[in-house]
Amino acid sequence: AYGGGNIMDWIGHHNDIAHWGAGMDASGPEEVEAIGWTQSSTDVYDTPVDYEIRCVYPGGVDWVIASHLPMGTRWIGEEGWVAVDRGKLTASDERWTRLDYDPGPVVIPASTDHIDNFIQGIKSRRTCVASAETAHRSITPGHLGFASHALGRRLRFDARTERVLNDSQAHALLDKTYRKPWKR
């Protein structure tokens, strides 16, 4: 889905945080379905202006990526919710947003400068906060959403093998033949 419009632009900025917060950086959805997509009323764009991608992740975790929802990431649990959006933190329980709140043993790496973090990663050979693998896994639901929309059906996906299951037509949309001399 080259040039995938707002979906493919913003999914990398928010879904990476969603994966990170849910402990699913190296994972992906098991099911994806595109719902209610509408195209631009002009011929300037060929990507949807309104969209919803519903995903099911391992453990039955429901995941919604949609243009009608506020920007950012929200985790909803049995005791309430926590949301982040490009530096802003809100929660159903205000105590969870206080700086003196003890989150437990979780250590979150900080990066206020992705460019410097990337350069330092090259120099040190350490994984960057926003690694290529994280970016790839974060935008995968968007690519699958485009395939689901194009075919008008829900897709089942194996994140380990990165294959659409039992749907060669859908998989073909996502797995293009490489030009020579490039190989897999």
Description of each model-found segment:
Residues 24-34, 62-65, 82-85, 127-131, ...:
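Acidic/polar loop patches that form or flank catalytic/metal-binding clefts of enzymes
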Residues 43, 55-112:
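NAD(P)-dinucleotide binding in Rossmann-like oxidoreductases
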Residues 1-58:
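Rossmann-like dinucleotide-binding domain that binds NAD(P)(H)
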Residues 46, 120-184:
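C-terminal helix-rich "cap/oligomerization" subdomain common to oxidoreductases
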Residues 5-8, 12-19, 112-116, 133-143:
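A structural signal for well-ordered alpha-helical segments within the folded catalytic domains
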Residues 1-8, 37-42, 101-108, 122-134:
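Active-site rim elements
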Residues 10, 14, 20, 46, ...:
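Tryptophan-centric aromatic hotspots in well-structured domains and transmembrane helices
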Residues 28, 49-51, 69-71, 78, ...:
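Residues that flank catalytic or metal-binding motifs in active/ligand-binding sites
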